[in-house]
């Protein structure tokens, strides 16, 4: 990342994985209670921010399928302007890398990186807690990315506790299919009564490499998604022939963990022709963590 008084360039918006995802209940308002562990990756979209003197917020790169006015990045910047009353403006460039509808948190991560970067570029000096209170207005995953550490999540995903995770390499395979999150959450076959676990339960298992990630918990959405989307089921089945694998979020991406980059790259090299795979290392904290206190 490069930093100047008028621009911040090469700001990573990292992907996340759900190492497990349990749905423990459903609220009267339709929201779901969940438990999960969020893992940051050193792979994601790259954003560039340049000050404008006219106060406007503008996305200067096209993102296919995402109108500028509804882009979470633009909404995040405008929310920050409205909250602080700053007269500053910004041009935002986005180099998209993460697929949409993949369970990797791409749009949410872009929004969080925008909040953190503009907190620095606009010299707002908002606390992390204040930024998280804004982030929750943008989406359930955005507060996690502002939180900036690997986390055990509860509630609707907004109750976060930092967890220390070992360094691992991941192969993430994304089928060429978009899985709408709302469709999966509303499916009558979705399990919504998984027994709650504790952080201690998870930490007791996370240092064991045997059978990881399926040595702890599951993704309650995986069975619903694989029953509806054959492409996802095919990836899960193929990866399981190599090593234990699990879907992240509501899909469609599926991941497997390895002890080294070499092992992950070797597995990627075996992917069938036309499959989209990425190798990424785990992160302990968000690259812009220092942009809020």
UniProtKB/Swiss-Prot annotation:
Active site annotation, chain numbering: 16, 141
- What is the catalytic activity of this protein? 4-CDP-2-C-methyl-D-erythritol + ATP = 4-CDP-2-C-methyl-D-erythritol 2-phosphate + ADP + H(+)
Q: One GO MF term, please?
A: ATP binding
User: What are the EC numbers?
Assistant: 2.7.1.148
Under which pathway is this protein filed?
Answer: Isoprenoid biosynthesis; isopentenyl diphosphate biosynthesis via DXP pathway; isopentenyl diphosphate from 1-deoxy-D-xylulose 5-phosphate: step 3/6
BP-aspect Gene Ontology terms: isopentenyl diphosphate biosynthetic process, methylerythritol 4-phosphate pathway; terpenoid biosynthetic process
Superkingdom is Bacteria
**Gene3D superfamilies named among the record's database cross-references:** 3.30.230.10, GHMP kinase, C-terminal domain
Q: Where does this protein hold ATP?
A: 99-109
Q: Which InterPro entries match?
A: GHMP_kinase_C_dom, GHMP_kinase_C_sf, GHMP_kinase_N_dom, IspE, Ribosomal_Su5_D2-typ_SF, Ribsml_uS5_D2-typ_fold_subgr
Record keywords, A-Z: ATP-binding, Isoprene biosynthesis, Kinase, Nucleotide-binding, Transferase
Which top EC class is named for this enzyme in its record? Answer: transferase
NCBIfam families cross-referenced by the UniProt entry: ispE, PRK14608.1
Q: What does this protein do?
A: Catalyzes the phosphorylation of the position 2 hydroxy group of 4-diphosphocytidyl-2C-methyl-D-erythritol.
User: Member of which family?
Assistant: Belongs to the GHMP kinase family. IspE subfamily.
Name listed for the protein in its UniProt record: 4-diphosphocytidyl-2-C-methyl-D-erythritol kinase
Upper lineage: Bacteria, Pseudomonadati, Pseudomonadota, Betaproteobacteria, Burkholderiales
């Amino acid at each position: 990342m490069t930093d100047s008084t008028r621009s911040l360039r090469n700001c990573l918006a990292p992907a996340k994985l759900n190492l497990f995802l349990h749905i423990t209940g459903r609220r009267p308002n339709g929201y779901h209670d969940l438990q999960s562990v969020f893992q940051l990756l050193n792979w994601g979209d790259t954003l560039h921010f340049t000050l404008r003197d006219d106060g406007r917020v503008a996305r200067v790169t096209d993102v296919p399928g995402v109108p500028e006015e509804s882009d979470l990045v633009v909404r995040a910047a405008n929310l920050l302007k409205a909250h602080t009353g700053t007269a500053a403006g910004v041009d935002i460039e986005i180099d998209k890398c993460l697929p949409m509808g993949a369970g990797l948190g791409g749009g949410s991560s872009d929004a969080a990186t925008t909040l953190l970067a503009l907190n620095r570029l606009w010299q707002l000096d908002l606390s992390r807690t204040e930024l998280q209170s804004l982030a929750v207005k943008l989406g359930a995953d955005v507060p996690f990315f502002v939180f900036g550490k690997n986390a055990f999540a509860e509630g609707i995903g907004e109750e976060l506790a930092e967890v220390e995770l070992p360094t691992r390499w991941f192969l993430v395979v994304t089928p060429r299919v978009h899985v709408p999150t709302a469709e999966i959450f509303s499916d009558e076959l979705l399990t919504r009564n998984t027994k709650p676990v504790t952080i201690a339960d998870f930490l007791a298992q996370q240092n064991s490499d045997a059978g990881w990630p399926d040595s702890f918990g599951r993704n309650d959405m995986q069975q619903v998604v694989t029953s509806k989307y054959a492409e996802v089921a095919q990836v899960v089945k193929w990866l399981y022939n190599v090593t234990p694998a699990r879907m992240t979020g509501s899909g469609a991406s599926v991941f497997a963990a390895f002890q080294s980059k070499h092992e992950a790259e070797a597995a990627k090299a075996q992917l069938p022709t036309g499959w989209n795979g990425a190798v990424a290392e785990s992160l302990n904290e968000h690259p812009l963590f220092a942009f809020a206190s």
